[in-house]
Amino acid sequence: LLRFGDSGFPRQQLQFAVNEMKFPNANDGKLLQPGEWYHVAVTYDTETKAAIMYVDGKEQSRIDDYGNGEAINLGKQKKGDFMFKIGHSYGDPDDMSRQLNGEICEVRIWNVLRSQEEIYRNMYDVDPQTTGLKAYWKFNEGKGNNIAKDLTGNGNDAVAYTTAIWPEGIEVPQKNKE
């Protein structure tokens, strides 16, 4: 679960949680500012059990010996199942108190460990056929469609639980261009 804040955490701090394990600890120096676009990536090494959070292609937080990673089920799920969600925290999908108050441009799911260099280089663009890329949603489908197509061709299309809102005219600043 990648989320903003929690009980005892600043509201603008990203936090990664698996079961009862959370990282990083509360830290006002790691706040994300409202109204700004950020590229966020989290990697998990199944061999070393290390999890790393990157913000704008730079390592922001790291934790070693972070539990036992399990595969994410991207398949269509029934209400009541542990569900993979984008823009909504855990719990019942009808509970709108746990949804993200913000916008998401893209989401990618990999089954290979990405290096900091790869994350930085591909912050804004990646070939959908790249080895290990299991799902890739751009969230630019347009009006009236509640399905975000999986660009990898793996069939992991994302279906909105409620009516999708497709903002227009979003320009995401490319922070990795020198």
At which residue positions do the language-model features occur?
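Extracellular glycan-associated modules
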Residues: L1-N156, Y161-E178
